[in-house]
Amino acid sequence: MLGENGIELKFVCIDVANGYMFKLIDFCKRIRELLPDVTLIAGNVVSREITEELVINGKIDIIKVGIGSGAVCTTRLQTGVGMAQLSAVMECADAAHGLNAALVSDGGICHPGDLGKAFGGGADFVMLGSMLAGHTECPGDLITDTDGTQYKLFYGMSSDTAMNKYHGGVASYRSSEGKTVRVPYKGDVQDTINNMLGGVRSTCTYIGASRIKDISKCATFVRVNRQVNTFYK
């Protein structure tokens, strides 16, 4: 299918903060009827039941998983709602893969090693924001502070900043569920991407996986109290 500008349309992402709504499932059905050959992505959710519902009745190809795990998201603090990202990925991946659907893990990525953990939990794709923030390619102005430090603003889509920018302010019946932070300027994004890709390659080497698809088959998770040696902080 071709879009208005003549570009071939291959993917459509139906993105809402709360995927636990019958309206979303009905909307996904209608989009599928309009776009029978397009890959449909929908979320966000964190549990088995709604994953199955979206795949079976919503006709979704890829489920987007994660509530409250983003670096600039405050949903868990404001609402008490959310689930540990790895636990959510493991539960939803089991349901999605059983129905021949795929899964994208959205949020919770702080270091390159977190990519390997997401893939190890069963994610087919990983979506991230904070590690890519602050680069030349990111939108927004490069701001120079009085001391010469350069930074860019990074904010959640449910933050005051986003709602003032896109919706004319925060509605009186709701609260902000995101924050705005200053991210030190990092330069070109390619260096960060190379670092992340290198981390994933090393993950595969350590656990004996020949490709990303095999990481979940080779990974074993162990609960620890301290992930790294903090002698030199």
Indicate where each model-derived feature is located:
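Short beta-strand/loop segments at the ligand-binding rim of alpha/beta enzyme cores
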Residues: 8-11, 31-46, 62, 95-107
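Short, surface-exposed basic-aromatic patches at helix termini and helix-loop junctions that form
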Residues: 32-34, 55-60, 119-120
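Short, conserved catalytic/metal-binding motifs centered on acidic residues
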Residues: 14, 63, 211
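Short, surface-exposed alpha-helical recognition segments that flank or form part
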Residues: 15, 19, 188-191
